[in-house]
């Protein structure tokens, strides 16, 4: 079976902006939404594909992978689309993009079974060196587990009654003109049930806080904003399901090296005589000492590239480069002997030492003629 192009699915150009993609998704999702196409399996399948396409094209990293390698590239990174997801998962994604009141007339397909999100997000700071070479880090964090006294209900003895606000539906509905909207019940938070009396053990929250520490692998080449997923390390539901822990990484800046994508930049200060004469110098790089051959007449801000000495790309495995940029240092004060030596050196070059005179001689003549006419 030939893969369907995500851009064709959403009917957008390959250079479409995020807003254009979102607008196209909104239009098509409304058109093929199952509530507007009851008993129409073709529309339901199209709705699934539209959501899959949007989930990829609305994510900068996934879109870049897809543009370069197609669906195979996504699958290699663990993204398998909606094929193995339940329809409720797809509806959850739909509502996460546009909210529960999106579109009007679409009721919630299922009541939330959880009192709190199962997935957890935390942040971690690592050094420049740790990002370059990869490492292992110990993570300490807190997560929620159901209260054993009330079995996660928040009610004394676990006794619940239908929510009087939404009459047990978990949703409340209201009309605006000819449109019907729904939103999560603010009293029971979508549960459809409320406690007759609050559990004394957890004060009605339905959970307690526990602490945990785990060791995670930081891959070589990770960058700020990248997330690491620790499966089944999140909050625990009343039914025993456990969410995932997502760790967002932030890389500290280094005093000597600067990262740009997968390349590393460093500044190499040299004296003006070294630039003029040329010289081989030893420079410290993140991966050890390297020899830098300065050519005769090296220019200020001239760059020298050390291939494969940069960061490893976490997706492709290819390493970036180290770019050493020269900064020429000139003396700010001279003694008499140094001045004399420099004057002699300048004289030894003759007219070569005053390139501005040759450059500007014709301009001087031209300007004179402007005033003699």
Swiss-Prot record:
It is found in: Cytoplasm. Pfam families: DnaJ (PF00226), DnaJ_C (PF01556), DnaJ_CXXCXGXG (PF00684). CDD domains: DnaJ, DnaJ_C, DnaJ_zf. Disulfide bonds: none annotated. A zinc finger (CR-type) spans 134-211. Its cofactor is Zn(2+). Zn(2+) 1 binds at residues 147, 150, 199, 202. Residues 5-70 form the J domain. GO terms for molecular function: ATP binding; heat shock protein binding; unfolded protein binding; zinc ion binding. Zn(2+) 2 binds at residues 163, 166, 185, 188. GO terms for biological process: chaperone cofactor-dependent protein refolding; DNA replication; protein refolding; response to heat. CXXCXGXG motif repeats lie at residues 147-154, 163-170, 185-192, 199-206. InterPro entries: DnaJ, DnaJ_C, DnaJ_domain, DnaJ_domain_CS, HSP40/DnaJ_pept-bd, HSP_DnaJ_Cys-rich_dom, HSP_DnaJ_Cys-rich_dom_sf, J_dom_sf. The keyword Electron transport does not apply. Binds 2 Zn(2+) ions per monomer. Keywords: Chaperone, Cytoplasm, DNA replication, Metal-binding, Repeat, Stress response, Zinc, Zinc-finger. GO terms for cellular component: cytoplasm. Participates actively in the response to hyperosmotic and heat shock by preventing the aggregation of stress-denatured proteins and by disaggregating proteins, also in an autonomous, DnaK-independent fashion. Unfolded proteins bind initially to DnaJ; upon interaction with the DnaJ-bound protein, DnaK hydrolyzes its bound ATP, resulting in the formation of a stable complex. GrpE releases ADP from DnaK; ATP binding to DnaK triggers the release of the substrate protein, thus completing the reaction cycle. The J domain is necessary and sufficient to stimulate DnaK ATPase activity. Zinc center 1 plays an important role in the autonomous, DnaK-independent chaperone activity of DnaJ. Zinc center 2 is essential for interaction with DnaK and for DnaJ activity. Belongs to the DnaJ family. Homodimer. This is Chaperone protein DnaJ. It comes from Nitratiruptor sp. (strain SB155-2). The gene is dnaJ.
